């Protein structure tokens, strides 16, 4: 089904810079997310008929309720998307609207080309309306497509009271892209039986498995002396960092893994001879493998310290989130409903693990099972990001189908 305001809504949202900041200690981490919630989303939620629309300064969530139109026994369902965008330029986003007929797409005057040679997924979108970047920023479909889809679905339901449904809760949260958005999620305030994050990618994605995730921060303490007299005296902290990295499995990196394979990812390395620091993320799906990965990292550090006869490798290892499959597989109702709705809409459900995490990972372990629905974005987190309007429309269809089906 086509929805009159969906595209307009989406374009309005993405033009607002809501990039999160991993170095901030505020909640949300950027004021722009607060402003987006209070000056754009909150008035719109109230205007389309949501009730008890309120912003929670304690966690940065904007929450609203669509009252039930039926007194039949059914589940209270929630829909959640995040307001922040990823770590890429989000200032002066200028979307392009392209009626795609195949071939390359010039991204404004940036000199960058969105080409099916580099991104074969473009070939799935012949004849569709694509929204792309101008090559200078990301787009922000992750996850403003999800926000636009939820908002459009709620507007449709509010204007069609003949559609019977139970109470629906909507939540728009901060800081998902830096992994802390759901840390302070208020389960009592949201109060649903189960929920969906609308934060997935291509048409049909339906996900209830995520990585289990840990962060690993290492500090290497060296000893700097003049290199001309360094023999048996210098301890090069940068070399220690390299030695640590070389002892991790060479083929267990993001660029060499897929499917259910886990990895170690070195994403930051800096330092001098005197001191160096490296930062990793550790990811795996199975609990036993996740534990093995963490133990290996600790063992390497311990063995290096033993060989050096002092604690020159300092380890900070901490869990970030866990595979939500452990919670959701206890009651597959939200998956079964979404799968059935997609099939009725001639959408093939793509039930695959998320090689990442969503806010739903943490929310599920807080007591609200929260799988993930497709929102349409492709090539997310960079200048080659795009989304299909037709996929966004089908995401709205699925949301409407879920609340009517239950």
Curated annotation (Swiss-Prot):
Single GO BP term: proteolysis
Residues at which Zn(2+) 2 binds: 142, 177, 381
EC number: 3.4.11.4
Pfam families the record matches: M20_dimer, Peptidase_M20
Main location group: cytoplasm
Subcellular location(s) per record: Cytoplasm
UniProt GO MF annotations: metallopeptidase activity; tripeptide aminopeptidase activity; zinc ion binding
Cofactor (UniProt): Zn(2+)
Keyword Ion transport on entry: no
Active site: 84, 176
Function: Cleaves the N-terminal amino acid of tripeptides.
Protein's recorded name: Peptidase T
UniProt organism field: Streptococcus agalactiae serotype III (strain NEM316)
């Amino acid at each position: 089904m086509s929805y009159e305001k969906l595209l307009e809504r989406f374009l309005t949202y993405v033009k607002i810079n809501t990039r999160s900041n991993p170095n901030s200690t505020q909640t949300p981490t950027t004021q722009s997310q607060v402003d987006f919630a209070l000056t754009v989303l909150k008035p719109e939620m109230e205007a389309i008929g949501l009730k008890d629309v309120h912003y929670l300064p304690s966690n940065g969530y904007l929450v609203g309720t669509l009252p039930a139109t039926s007194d039949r026994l059914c589940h209270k369902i929630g829909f959640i998307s995040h307001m922040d965008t990823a770590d890429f330029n989000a200032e002066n986003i200028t979307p392009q609207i392209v009626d795609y007929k195949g071939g390359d797409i010039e991204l404004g005057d940036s000199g960058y080309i969105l080409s099916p040679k580099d991104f074969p997924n473009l070939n799935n979108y012949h004849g569709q309306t694509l929204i792309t970047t101008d090559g200078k920023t990301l787009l922000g479909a992750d996850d403003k497509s999800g926000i636009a889809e939820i908002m459009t679905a709620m507007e449709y339901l509010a204007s069609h009271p003949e559609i019977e449904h139970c109470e629906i809760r909507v939540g728009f949260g901060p800081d998902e892209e830096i992994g802390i958005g759901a840390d302070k999620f208020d389960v009592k305030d949201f109060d649903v039986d189960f929920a969906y994050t609308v934060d997935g990618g291509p048409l049909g994605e339906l996900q209830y498995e995520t990585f289990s995730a840990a962060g690993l921060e290492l500090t290497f303490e060296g000893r700097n002396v003049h290199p001309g007299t360094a023999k048996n005296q210098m301890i090069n902290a940068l070399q220690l960092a390299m030695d640590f990295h070389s002892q991790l499995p060479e083929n267990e990196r993001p660029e060499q893994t897929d499917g259910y394979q886990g990895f170690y990812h070195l994403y930051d390395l800096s330092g001098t001879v005197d001191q160096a620091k490296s930062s990793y993320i550790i990811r795996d799906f199975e609990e036993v493998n996740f534990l093995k990965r963490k133990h290996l990292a600790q063992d390497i550090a311990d063995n290096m310290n033993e060989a050096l006869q002092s604690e020159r490798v300092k380890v900070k290892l901490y869990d970030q989130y866990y595979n939500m499959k452990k919670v959701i597989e206890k009651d597959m109702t939200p998956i079964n409903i979404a799968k059935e709705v997609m099939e009725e809409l001639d959408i093939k459900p793509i039930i695959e693990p998320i090689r990442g995490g969503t806010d739903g990972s943490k929310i599920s372990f807080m007591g609200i099972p929260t799988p993930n629905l497709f929102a349409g974005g492709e090539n997310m987190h960079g200048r080659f990001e795009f989304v299909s309007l037709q996929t966004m429309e089908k995401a709205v269809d699925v949301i409407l189908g879920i609340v009517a089906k239950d």
